[in-house]
A protein has these predicted regions:
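Short, non-transmembrane alpha-helical segments in secretory-pathway proteins
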Residues: 92, 96-121, 238-253, 296-338, ...
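Aromatic/basic-lined ligand-recognition segments
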Residues: 332-369, 401-404, 410-412
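Preferential activation on post-signal-peptide N-terminal prodomains/segments
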Residues: 17-304, 427-428
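Sec-dependent signal peptide hydrophobic core
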Residues: 10-18
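Short helix-loop boundary/capping segments
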Residues: 357-392
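N-terminal Lys/Arg-rich, disordered targeting/topogenic segments
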Residues: 1-7
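Secondary-structure-rich domain cores
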Residues: 257-283, 292, 297-353
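Conserved histidines in hydrophobic membrane contexts and catalytic metal-binding motifs
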Residues: 309, 344, 364-366, 405, ...
Length: 429
């Protein structure tokens, strides 16, 4: 490399550093309207924009597979046309990767939220923007943590929402959501950092429509409908732990070696160790409980508890649940426990439908207390699309008949065959 080229490269590097420095200082000085976001949020935002980590290396694949991915996403163009996805997990993954940054930017830069009304919320859903719908309400502070924000904007911390959207209105961006606890609607102006139009313009509207756009009197007006999707498959279910190799791997993950051997009670293997006891049923259900008293060395936040539980799910159920195009394990909800700690619930979602796994509907529940897992129940299943067709009422008619909020569901009663149905939400035992 000659001296002139070397000088030019140094100049280019200096220019890049100066630009980054200016952007960083602007961020820190609230130049972009980020009223409460910190430098960590800037780095998370930079990673989301560049697709890499702070050190410049590519972001790991796990980054796009957060426990709180939505079960429905809609892009709305300037004319009010929607491109919606609900039933294809691969399409949901792709859209999530390309649209999560709008919510990262909104949650980190929002002005204090202001109460608004249903009419404004409906207008927002028909405006240029991006819409996320979750299987259960998610605390916005937790959603921010999944997106890489250390602290969401002031006023958003305590809110929880199933449905939220970020819109572009006259060159200004706004976050809208419905608070789950009160049912009230809120909006907050946010910074304009990424062009929503660039993303929505890459897709042509499909049949997606919100229920209120077809029927103003709908009992579930904000349900996203896909009228052109008229067929939903039946599913086949199997117990992956019937494989000796899979069983051995799962046992090792859970801290169980082959010796000493378990004893058996009513077709259930019982493993007793110094610091835990574990039951493995012949239907693939694992019940694990810590036996020693957990040291109280720190308080676990809700976000930390969910992350810890999600890591366990990734190492266990997610490895055996089936093809990633068909099924995934989704975060469902959190219960704060008396005496401290959190119980985290997860659910299988297959072919775009929530699996109701008997007896209580969940794929797993994991309790985290004092910085460690103290108890868990894991229900191992492998789901695949059945070759037999399923008969189901079309979605639009189901919306009219539901009398409330609903989504596609599958009832796993242990028979091995799951037919689709339209249950009302919330999905609880």
């Amino acid at each position: 490399m000659n001296r002139r080229k070397l000088i030019e490269l140094v100049k280019d590097a200096v220019i890049v550093l100066l630009v980054l420095s200016a952007v960083f200082l602007g961020w820190e000085s609230r130049l972009f309207g980020n009223t409460s976001a910190d430098a960590g949020s800037f780095m998370a935002l930079w990673q989301s924009i560049t697709g890499g980590t702070a050190g410049g290396s590519p972001a790991p694949a796990q980054q796009a597979a957060q426990p709180g991915k939505p079960v429905a996403i809609a892009l709305t163009d300037g004319a009010g046309g929607h491109y919606g996805v609900k039933y294809s997990l691969s399409e949901l993954d792709n859209l999530y990767v390309n649209t999560a940054r709008y919510f990262l930017e909104a949650l980190s830069s929002a002005q204090p939220p202001q109460e608004t009304d249903a009419q404004a919320w409906r207008a927002a859903l028909k405006s240029l923007g991006v819409y996320f719908e979750y299987i259960s309400p998610v605390r916005l502070s937790v959603l921010g943590d999944w997106l890489g924000i250390s602290n969401v904007a002031a006023g958003l911390e305590g809110a929880a929402a199933r449905r939220l959207c970020v819109i572009d209105s006259g060159g200004k961006n706004y976050l809208y959501f419905q608070d789950d606890a009160t049912g009230k609607f809120y909006m907050a102006q946010t910074a304009v950092l990424s062009s929503i139009a660039d993303q929505t313009g890459a897709f042509s509207p499909n049949s997606a429509v919100f229920a209120f756009e077809k029927n103003e009197d709908s009992a579930a007006p904000y349900t996203l409908l896909l009228p052109d999707v008229t067929e939903h498959p039946a599913l086949d279910a199997a117990n992956p732990l019937s494989s000796a190799a899979a069983k051995t791997k799962v046992l090792l993950t859970l801290g169980v070696s082959e010796l000493p051997k378990p004893y058996t009670v009513d077709d259930t293997e019982v493993y007793v160790r110094n610091n835990f006891i574990m039951y493995l049923s012949n239907d693939g259900t694992v019940s694990w409980t810590a036996q020693d008293e957990a040291p109280v060395y720190r308080v676990t936040t809700e976000s930390e508890a969910i992350d810890m539980a999600a890591d366990m799910i990734a190492d266990t159920l997610a490895d055996y649940c089936g093809s990633s195009d068909t099924v995934a394990v989704y975060y469902d909800s959190t219960q704060e426990q008396a005496g401290g700690g959190y119980r985290i619930f997860f659910r299988y979602v297959a072919a775009g439908g929530a699996v109701y796994l008997r007896p209580d509907g969940y794929a797993a529940s994991i309790t985290v207390k004092n910085g460690r897992i103290s108890e868990m129940e894991l229900r191992f299943r492998t789901y695949s699309v059945s070759t037999e067709p399923a008969v189901l009422l079309p979605e639009v008619q189901a919306a009219a008949a539901a009398g409330g909020d609903f989504m596609l569901g599958y009832d796993d009663d242990g028979s091995g065959r799951l037919a689709p149905f339209w249950p009302k939400l919330p999905l609880r035992s």
